[in-house]
Design a protein with these regions (language model features):
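C-terminal terminal-subdomain/extension
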Residues: 2, 66-124
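Short linear motifs in intrinsically disordered
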Residues: 1-2, 53
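Compact nucleic-acid interaction/catalytic patches
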Residues: 20-25, 30-65
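Short, charged beta-turn/beta-strand-edge "cap" motif at the junction between a beta-strand
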Residues: 15-19
Length: 124
């Protein structure tokens, strides 16, 4: 497998899952830092869904269209951060732009984890 980078989208096997946890083979977005991606046997990802009707209005969901090699409008689910073994990654699909990662994905992760967010004017 080629070097895995933050912002890459892969098909991955998330296993069985319980209740509302995302499960099975599905696209995931790599959110782990690149140093960890290089050295660690595990990888931190966010599941991606095409069930947009459930994603609307949730601040932890980021809609992506015509990005990252996905064929359908999809939503990245920042509330379901998961760490998996790299052997569960299969096919590379594409990469989100650095702008999308910085602006949208990072903000959704901050909301999920309760971290301070930047306001529109750049101040905290």
């Amino acid at each position: 497998m080629d070097e895995i980078r933050r912002g890459d989208i892969y098909l991955a096997d998330l296993g069985e899952g319980t209740g509302s946890e995302q499960r099975g083979v599905r696209p995931v977005l790599v959110v782990q830092n690149d140093k960890g991606n290089h050295f660690s046997p595990t990888i931190t990802v966010l599941p991606i869904t095409t069930k947009i009707h459930k994603a609307k209005g949730l601040p932890t969901h980021v809609l992506i269209e015509n990005m990252g090699g996905l064929e359908q409008i999809s939503a990245v689910m920042a509330e379901q951060i998961v760490t998996i073994d790299k052997v569960k990654l299969f096919t590379y699909l594409g990469t989100l732009s650095k702008e999308a990662m910085k602006k949208d994905i990072n903000e959704a992760i901050k909301i999920q984890l309760g971290l301070p967010r930047r306001r529109e004017n750049g101040r905290k």
